[in-house]
Amino acid sequence: MKTLSLKPSEIEKKWILIDADGLVLGRLASQIAMRLRGKHKPTYTPHMDCGDNVIVINAEKVKLTGNKRQDDIFYWHTGYPGGIKGRSKGQILDGRFPERVIIKAVERMVPRGPLGRRQMGNLRVYAGTAHPHEAQQPEVLDVAAMNPKNKRSA
């Protein structure tokens, strides 16, 4: 039997909606990364963008286990001497763009290259419940029901 290799015309992309309310960040990010890459499909082809389009809502309500909310820090450098800066995940979640925490977590689970960048373009993350993709009729994926560890109450 020959190995299946999809052609661009055979790729079928679906739209998936995930509610991040109360979900653990790392477990959520790994599910999103798998869906973006298309590894959940039997027709997965490593060199093609065969993953689905993923919409994540309620990004500000994502949970972090342990002390990661204050201990995990995103660093960057301004380019000036002594210009190292940093913000904790908690500060970012409480700030203006809480969706960046999910985007960064998924970005680090997807390959770094031209294909990975194209796959990351299929991810849309929104802080609240509203999203402009109702016309695509996304199907809801319940990540919390997959494993009890995926959801945190407190």
Curated annotation (Swiss-Prot):
A cellular component term, taken from the record's GO annotations: cytosolic large ribosomal subunit
Keyword line: Ribonucleoprotein, Ribosomal protein
Keyword Ribosomal protein assigned: yes
Molecular function terms, GO-annotated: mRNA binding; structural constituent of ribosome
Gene3D superfamilies documented for this protein: Ribosomal protein L13 (3.90.1180.10)
Pfam families per record: Ribosomal_L13
Example GO BP: negative regulation of translation
Organism superkingdom: Bacteria
Assembly and binders: Part of the 50S ribosomal subunit.
NCBIfam families reported for this sequence: rplM_bact
Similarity annotation: Belongs to the universal ribosomal protein uL13 family.
PANTHER family xref list: LARGE RIBOSOMAL SUBUNIT PROTEIN UL13M, RIBOSOMAL PROTEIN L13
Role noted for this protein: This protein is one of the early assembly proteins of the 50S ribosomal subunit, although it is not seen to bind rRNA by itself. It is important during the early stages of 50S assembly.
Protein name, as recorded: Large ribosomal subunit protein uL13
Organism: Rhodospirillum centenum (strain ATCC 51521 / SW)
